[in-house]
Amino acid sequence: MAKVLIINGSPRVNGNTSIAVREMENVFQENGVEVKTVQIGNKDIRGCIACGHCYETGKCAFDDVVNELAAEFEEADGLVVASPVYYASANATLIACLDRLFYSTHFDKRMKVGASVVCARRGGCSATFDELNKYFTISNMPDSGIWQ
């Protein structure tokens, strides 16, 4: 059975981003895909400090949800990252998480499919999609494309 990890970067547990994530969960489950969703937008996640600990040990020096996500990410066949748009950018907590998650994990990501979900009142979606999809591109992960 295929597995997908969804990282919800919204600080609002029942906001618009969560509604979009729940819709994706339903579609995945209807198609026999195992889904694990983690809400990180309301967590205290530090940014990378470039200490090199992950290069030496394979895990981040900060023992928080990022190290837990690393194991889930390695097991998953796909990764969905979801975020509200703040000033044409993803939530800063999500970016800190993704910076550390992608930098500290050394497994091959080339066959893991990536997808981004963004929610905005007005503009900024294109810039935020670009910001999030670069994690997939840099890791040679195929992305699911942009659906609006």
Spans of features found by a protein language model:
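Cofactor-binding loop segments of dinucleotide-utilizing enzymes, especially the Rossmann-like FAD-
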Residues: 9, 40, 118-121
